[in-house]
Amino acid sequence: MEAALLLAKLPEAYSIFDPLVDVLPLIPLFFLLLAFVWQAAVGFK
């Protein structure tokens, strides 16, 4: 029961990280975009 209460409090405890959690799923898209821009810069060799 204590573990359930602890898990219930975690989102409140880590609420300051909410903006970071919102951005994290976008990071792979940034890598994909970076790879495309890099290939465009070297002429798609």
UniProtKB/Swiss-Prot annotation:
Organism: Picosynechococcus sp. (strain ATCC 27264 / PCC 7002 / PR-6) (Agmenellum quadruplicatum)
Its membrane topology: Single-pass membrane protein
One Gene Ontology term, aspect cellular component: plasma membrane-derived thylakoid membrane
Segments traversing the membrane: 24-44
Domain of life: Bacteria
Subunit structure: PSII is composed of 1 copy each of membrane proteins PsbA, PsbB, PsbC, PsbD, PsbE, PsbF, PsbH, PsbI, PsbJ, PsbK, PsbL, PsbM, PsbT, PsbX, PsbY, PsbZ, Psb30/Ycf12, peripheral proteins PsbO, CyanoQ (PsbQ), PsbU, PsbV and a large number of cofactors. It forms dimeric complexes.
Family, per entry: Belongs to the PsbK family.
Described purpose of this protein according to its UniProt entry: One of the components of the core complex of photosystem II (PSII). PSII is a light-driven water:plastoquinone oxidoreductase that uses light energy to abstract electrons from H(2)O, generating O(2) and a proton gradient subsequently used for ATP formation. It consists of a core antenna complex that captures photons, and an electron transfer chain that converts photonic excitation into a charge separation.
Name the UniProt record assigns to this protein: Photosystem II reaction center protein K
One GO term of the biological process aspect: photosynthesis
Subcellular location: Cellular thylakoid membrane
